[in-house]
Amino acid sequence: MSFKTLDDIGDLTGKTVLVREDLNVPMQDGAVTDDTRLRATIATLNELSDKGAKVLVLAHFGRPKGQPSEEFSLKKLAAPLAHVLGRPVSYIDWESDKAAVAALTPGAIAVLENTRFFDGEEKNDPAVIERFASLGDIYVNDAFSAAHRAHASTEGLAHVLPAYAGRAMEAELKALQKALGEPERPVAAVVGGAKVSTKLDVLKHLVSKVDHLIIGGGMANTFLAARGVNVGKSLCEHDLTGTAEEILDNADKSGCTVHLPYDVVVSKEFTANPPSLRTCNVHEVAADEMILDVGPAAVEALADVLKTCKTLVWNGPMGAFETEPFDAATVALARTAAALTKEGSLVSVAGGGDTVAALNHAGVVGDFSYISTAGGAFLEWMEGKELPGVAALEG
């Protein structure tokens, strides 16, 4: 994987740089409730500003469906972004963009209005690409989380302007290359979450890539059912047991060991600390019980597996982690991975919305080698798919 970074960009005196960032942050009552994505822009935007470029931020917000609206305007994000960057950020609407850009001074940073106010943005329309390109001299893509989309601002611009990866994009691509591109072996993957159906392509791809595949969450029940285990009234996609068997067969052929729980935490009701809570062997689940977490013996065995590995890719929780005590397996395994990473024996990469929340809950987000905030793009990377926004940067 070869792509140009900000190290290759040269003298920026008198240049205007279009930077695609991800500003699609959660907001409540006009305030940003999680500024993770804003903070991810700091390295790129401040570096370009310090080098004297006029910096224009391209981003989308919500789903305005090609129509301008106050609700989806990026105007309200100029101030929060300025706060995070520690320097002024102005806002430019599409009505006055050319004059406003011309009036900017070297080093100035401005947020352009929502790219999705153009109907052609999501269609990668050449006219929209040209409209964006007319404002700048150089294109920087710093939004890995939008790299799975072939849109005008994420893919099209890279073909008409000199294109570079921003610092956040560069860090993400290097981490992912280390995890699955050219990993140190043995490699383990933890895949959890509620449904097999949402991660079928991930599982199919991983069995040919990793040495150990650890399956948890509700999706483990479908694999247990495929192996003839009665899972009671657990969440289970019985119509996919055939597909689960195929994945297990392919794992055998590829030399990938699949780890399923052999003891589980069950309950008759799904509430915090229910009276019917118990731990049992997977073959002892009663007809009126639900499997809600991986059991402690299996977690201990999985921790031993991680101790033999050099690389870990993690996506999805081991159990219903939002409700105690069904967070125990996720927390214990995450803490093992974090400890191994801190001592230098494991490279750990994790991503996906639920995953970040689960690792936050375990208090280990800062201890993993790399945490991706990308949802769909991270999953598509785990599926082995080419990401248009990344492919356009390669040269």
UniProtKB/Swiss-Prot annotation:
The keyword Membrane does not apply. It catalyses: (2R)-3-phosphoglycerate + ATP = (2R)-3-phospho-glyceroyl phosphate + ADP. Substrate binds at D22, L23, N24, R37, H60, F61, G62, R63, R116, R149. ATP binds at K199, E322, G352, G353, D354, T355. It is found in: Cytoplasm. Pfam families: PGK. One of its GO terms (cellular component) is cytosol. Coiled coil: none annotated. This is Phosphoglycerate kinase. It comes from Novosphingobium aromaticivorans (strain ATCC 700278 / DSM 12444 / CCUG 56034 / CIP 105152 / NBRC 16084 / F199).
